[in-house]
Amino acid sequence: MTATVSPRPDAADAAPGPGEVVSAQEQARRGGDPARWPEKLPVRDRLSVLFDSGTFVEDGLLATASDARLPADGVITGVGRVQGRPVAVIAHDFTVKAGSWGELTCEKQIRILERADRDLLPVVYLVDSAGGRLTDQMGFFPGRRGASAIFQLQVKLSGRVPQLCCLHGPSAAGGAYMPAFCDWVGMVAGQGSMYLASPRVAEKVTGERTTLEEMGGAMMHAAVSGCGDEVFDADWEAVAAARLLLSYLPDDFRGRPPRREPVEPVRADWDELVPADPNVSYDVREVVDRLVDAGTFFEIKARWAQEMVVGFARLDGGVVGIVANQPSVRSGAIFVDSADKAARFISLCDAFNIPLLFLQDVPGFMVGVEVERQGIIRHGAKMIAAMASAEVPKYTVVLRKAYAAGYYAMCAPGFEPRATLALPGATIGPMSAEASVNAVYANKIAAIQDDAERAEFVAARTVEQQADLNLLRMGSDLVVDAVVPPEALRAELAARMVDAEGWSRTPGRRHHLISPV
């Protein structure tokens, strides 16, 4: 149904009566004509997916009521309940000037963020905006209550309350930073995009010809840039995922995620799931499936930096953040992007009081000219600093191998995990026994002419090196706290996590922001 456009009232017009006010509210609630975008779920239907039925209370519905072309000034703001918990929302209405921002669009967003800051409410952003409304640029751009104030408030809220974003359409120019400041970004395939300049502008500036999907589309940001966390086929799926993710997070930095009734894992059979040969790959998600409550693993940034797997899960009913090396991708080595991915997730868990579980199977940080030029040391330091500074309970499990600085970055004993556990076949050391022999005896090996003699020498030295990496030695020297059969690992972790439920932060320590990737 197409909304009727009323003429702008003149100053000489009589004051509107009650019926006209009600009519104006109804017209504002209808918004524009969604029939022009049949592939999109109307914005108020998105809100129906997000909130418990009948709980949404809206603010500012009559914004720009004097101009019927701008119902609610293109944005819906207010507070509703998600599983009984109050949550603030900013939802752009794509049927009103493509969701673009004017002066009152900014004012409404600022006010709801100020309320979220005051009342410590989680915020969900349903973004679908062409950016600033250039016909109102003096209203939305330069002043104290313009777009910059929105970003200021987002940063202020970072680490204080969860901020989740569903990207249903464009998020253009400066507006692209709205999702970038959020803790999680779900993007709708073929619709969601974020970019600082359109392909047309990019061509004028740089001369390169590209498409919107290639430069700022959902799959690009989820798999290449790391700005997106997941890609969804439909609007409702993205909103439903945000609603689910809220169940893993507390209302604010002072609380803890709600516990649920424990559920047995989806799989219990290990059957040599972790191969003894360190050169044979496996999917660490199969390990996760055997440790956590069935159906509870919520992976973060699954398409980006896939050599590192991170996500939320429930273990015996309690929420835990998982940081795991992925042997099936790049042998689980840590690269620049995977270090950033882990660092941000660790910071997110620490901000919201979620214990961390590190699953180690790591050959170390990647080496070579390319990664050194990319700043692997700097990015690795970012990951180590995030892990070392996290005050939440940390638990480390060495699944198979833990070598070099990768062992440190994945929460080695010196970084004060509550416990360091190991499966029976695990090895720990500066490098593998074979690599150690090549490093220590390189000249001597090269000097042996006879092939058989050389092989015998290398084999003997390798056995010697393996003695130092032996897990019995690690247990004897108290490097590991316990060697646990895989079938008993879930129960062991659950018992240790329950024992640490009374943990508290350093007195006087305040919340910290969650730095963008």
Protein language model features and the residues they cover:
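Ligand-binding clefts of soluble mixed alpha/beta catalytic domains
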Residues: M1-V517
